[in-house]
A protein has these predicted regions:
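N-terminal periplasmic "start-of-domain" segments of outer-membrane beta-barrel proteins
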Residues: 30-61, 89, 223
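Extracytoplasmic beta-strand/coil segments of soluble accessory domains associated
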Residues: 36, 67, 71-108
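N-terminal periplasmic accessory domains that precede
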Residues: 66-69, 88-91, 100-103, 119-124, ...
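Short acidic/polar hinge/loop motifs at secondary-structure boundaries
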Residues: 108-136
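Periplasmic-side early beta-strands and strand-to-turn transitions of outer-membrane beta-barrels
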Residues: 140-141, 153-155, 159-163, 169-171, ...
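Structural signature of Gram-negative outer-membrane beta-barrels, strongest in the C-terminal barrel
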Residues: 231, 271, 284, 315-323, ...
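Outer-membrane beta-barrel signature, preferentially recognizing the C-terminal barrel domain
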Residues: 254-274, 301-304, 371-372, 390-392, ...
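Gram-negative outer-membrane beta-barrel transporters
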Residues: 354-356, 361, 446-448, 465-539, ...
């Protein structure tokens, strides 16, 4: 991964549910300074949020799986029920995907028909993606429910120069894994177009460690983006996504196989209007997920979401800016034809004030009015102080919530009178840069959740769990360039997550990731990465330790021309046998080769 941590300092991170997303779509190149840690833009040095960025090179190194690329970031871990296509959860600061918002080109893609509203990262492939941005900490004041741990924003491929352009990638590797992706686009002063197609297929390996048969995965996907500048003041656009995949899995420990077909589709249309000091953005989006398991207890899960949103912003003074908006969301779930639905209307605002050049303050407030239970207030305050030209201190405090899912409220095991889970989070970080060669960063975090919703065996239904769930820890990261050709990056995370004093399952206490990037020649580059995970508990009922493990990955890339490169990736070089979920396999030693051409 080429200097990921240093790029976290330099890359743009387009981040906002509306205007920020729209403006990121306007920006063709990665701006070196501008970020969105809230509704209003700011510089990376001035944001109080902790933001991580994966660009297309990082995603390529992670292979077809976006989850594998995310898992090497500080504060992030992965739990997977097998290989590509199986159920996989990304944990951020000890909290699983239930508490993580996910958006693709401004479209919310978490599944309303899931047991808990969440996104399955096991089926997210990297072929059509250009950038993945993670903003950590409770973000309910910005994004509403399901953002207690943070939000992941995904942007698909975009043209980076005027005229017609594109990119094609072909890859083949272990487990008979085949990947093909093609993107084409066009841009000029008024129009931007992008269209991407991707196909991934693999024979895979057995998901369960007790079985022997392979569990394969195949998926086709497409993404589209178009925007047109109608006048100097009005811009309109649309983004869309579609995927159709089939995942094989093990139903039991006795070679009992099964498969799930999932079709996802989404569409978003937006209009941006500029009026002097004012900016307005109107958008409507829809998302649908259709999962089918012919032999499952529940065979068909259909989840739908419709959302309408307005966001406005204005610069009140040279030091103060205000953003505000409203949105309406309706979610529906159908389980074998039995339908449930719920809606909410929200109002939100953010104010940002910079009393002096080295200090920026921001505050957010949001109110959600739900159709099924009492409304919820959530808030966030953040501060960034540039103590010196090389040192930045940032901190944030937020309150949030997770509304019970449609399945938890209305499904076959629904609980009576479920209330939203509520949370509080705090983080404090210091970042220091040593010239152009090195960076060090330390961030302490604390998140607690009350009214946790879990399945109760005593009542055979979902119920609120007494006590408090708390996750606390420390993230350390850094990078150092020994020369123009050799650099080092690394991060370590300590996490202690407990519910009423009992450790949570599948949360590593220790995670370490180190990488060395070496440009052998002007055309040949290589990356060696070592990842170590220790002290993880898992099990059913009684939690017992999983074995600690160390995984070594090696990759190399050769530039055939200025726009074409060939690459090879050797993953799990030492053929380490390990589990991230008890009883489920992970990949053994695997080799992948590919070629990528820009035109």
């Amino acid at each position: 991964m080429k200097n990921t941590l240093m790029r976290t300092l330099l890359c743009s991170a387009a981040f906002s549910p509306s205007l920020a997303q729209a403006q990121s779509e306007t920006t063709f190149d990665l701006a070196p300074i501008l970020v969105y840690g809230g509704l209003l833009p700011t510089t990376l040095e001035a944001t109080g949020a902790t933001i991580e960025v994966l660009d297309s090179e990082d995603l390529k190194e992670g292979g077809a799986s976006v989850a594998d690329a995310l898992a090497v970031l500080p504060g992030v871990s992965l739990s997977a029920n097998g290989g590509l296509g199986t159920r996989s959860s990304i944990r951020v600061r000890g909290l699983d995907g239930t508490y993580l918002g996910v958006r693709v080109d401004g479209i919310e893609v978490t599944d309303p028909s899931s047991t808990q509203t969440s996104f399955n990262f096991g089926t997210l492939t990297s072929g059509t993606l250009d950038r993945v941005t993670l903003i950590k900490g409770t973000q309910s004041a910005l994004y509403g429910s399901d953002a207690i741990a943070g939000v992941i924003d995904i942007q698909t491929w975009r043209p980076t120069r005027d005229g017609a352009s594109g990119r094609t990638t072909l890859e083949y590797g272990s487990y008979n894994t085949r990947t093909a992706t093609s993107s084409v686009g066009f841009r000029d002063d008024r129009i931007e177009l992008a269209f991407s197609l991707s196909r991934v297929a693999t024979d895979g390996f057995s998901a369960r460690s007790s079985d022997t048969e392979d569990d394969g995965f195949d998926q086709s996907s497409a993404n589209v983006f178009a925007a047109y500048q109608l006048t100097d003041a009005v811009r309109v656009g649309v983004s869309g996504l579609w995927s159709d995949g089939t995942s094989e899995f093990d139903r039991s420990s006795s070679n009992s196989t099964g498969s799930t077909e999932e079709v996802r589709s989404g569409l978003r249309v937006f209009t941006e209007v500029s009026q002097g000091a004012w900016e307005h953005e109107f958008s409507v989006s829809g998302f649908r997920s259709d999962r089918f398991d012919a032999d499952g207890f529940t065979k068909e899960f259909i989840g739908e979401r419709l959302k309408a949103e307005y966001v406005g912003q204005v610069e009140l003074t040279s030091a103060t800016a205000l953003a505000f908006g409203i949105d309406w969301t309706e979610e529906r779930a159908s389980l074998d034809g039995t339908e449930f639905e719920a809606s909410n209307t929200a109002a939100f605002a953010e104010i940002k004030h910079a009393p002096r050049d080295d200090l920026e303050l921001s505050a957010n407030l949001r109110y959600d009015d739900f159709s099924d239970f009492d409304g919820q207030f959530s808030g966030r305050a953040a501060l960034a102080w540039t103590a010196t030209d090389a040192t930045t201190v940032r901190t944030s405090f937020g309150t949030g919530y997770r509304a019970p899912s449609l399945y938890e409220r209305f499904g076959p095991y629904s609980g009576p009178d479920l209330a939203p889970e509520t949370s509080r989070s705090f983080d404090l970080g210091v970042e220091h840069r040593i010239g152009e060669t090195a960076m060090l960063r330390a961030t302490a975090f604390y998140i607690e959740i009350d009214n946790l919703i879990q399945y109760s065996t005593a009542t055979s239904s979902y119920a609120q769990v007494p006590g408090t769930t708390a996750s606390k820890g420390l993230e350390l990261s850094g990078s150092y360039s020994f020369s123009d050709r050799l650099s080092f990056t690394g991060n370590y995370t300590y996490t202690l997550a407990k519910n009423d004093g009992v450790r949570l399952a599948r949360v590593p206490r220790h995670e370490l990731s180190m990488a060395a990037d070496f440009d052998v020649t002007d055309r040949l580059s290589s990356t060696l990465r070592v990842t170590h995970v220790a002290d993880v508990l898992d099990g059913f009922g009684t939690l017992t330790p999983l074995a600690d493990y160390t995984v070594v990955d090696l990759s190399a890339q050769y530039d055939l021309t200025d726009r074409t490169n060939a690459y090879v990736s050797l993953r799990n070089l030492t053929d380490e046998t390990y589990e991230t979920v008890r009883g489920y396999n992970t990949s053994g030693r695997a080799l992948y080769v590919g070629i990528q051409a820009d035109f």
